[in-house]
């Protein structure tokens, strides 16, 4: 292949990957895919651009995304992967997922006072600072989103403050679990809308309307 390329270009052999998943990124128009997962002939995964290799996500979201990729590429079983996601969602709703799995990790990029808008991670950093801890650019913040009303930033606690029965399952399902897998399933033509709590509520309302009709 290299013989047909310009002199300034040369391809290097990385390995043989029998299967892979390529997912488009929001806002990407053409060009190379920014998210992909490959499995080589020895069963080893190579993951680039997915939440499994990024911060700002909880362990449960990272774990389930990697497990879904493994079930699709290693087991060739998308249905098994989908059922697994449904089970994890059920466990979240039943408060069976351990607290340490819903902890969200993020890094403060600048001084707290420099943030014009207060997001959940900034609110958590403010709590940490209020405890007398030093918070500066590069500080790793660990927090949990708990149940309650109001904005998400008003419902965060540090991982050392939160209790097992406090975490907001709905938040993690809608903002962590589903976003971490929906584009993977979309590539396979599998709709994840039924996993959403909003979808479940619509279904319940439709059933009640039909019953009352």
Regions found by a protein language model. Name each.
Residues 1-213:
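DNA-dependent DNA polymerase catalytic subunits
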């Amino acid at each position: 292949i290299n013989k047909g390329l310009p002199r300034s270009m040369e391809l290097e052999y990385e390995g043989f990957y029998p299967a892979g998943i390529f997912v488009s990124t929001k806002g990407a128009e053409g060009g190379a895919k920014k998210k992909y997962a490959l499995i080589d002939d020895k069963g080893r995964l190579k993951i680039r651009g997915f939440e499994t290799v990024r911060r700002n996500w909880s362990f449960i979201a990272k774990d389930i995304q990697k497990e879904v990729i493994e079930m699709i590429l290693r087991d060739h079983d998308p249905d098994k992967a989908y059922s697994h996601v449904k089970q994890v969602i059920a466990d979240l709703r039943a408060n069976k997922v351990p607290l340490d799995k819903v902890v969200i990790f993020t890094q403060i990029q600048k001084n707290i006072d420099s943030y014009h808008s207060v997001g959940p991670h900034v609110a958590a950093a403010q709590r940490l600072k209020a405890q007398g801890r030093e918070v500066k650019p590069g500080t790793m913040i660990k927090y949990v989103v708990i149940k309650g009303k109001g904005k998400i930033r008003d419902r965060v606690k540090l991982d050392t403050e939160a209790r097992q029965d406090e975490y907001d399952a709905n938040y993690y399902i809608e903002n962590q679990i589903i976003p971490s897998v929906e584009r993977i399933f979309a590539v396979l033509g599998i709709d994840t809308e039924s996993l959403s709590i909003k979808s479940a509520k619509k279904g319940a309302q439709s059933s009640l309307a039909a019953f009352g009709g």
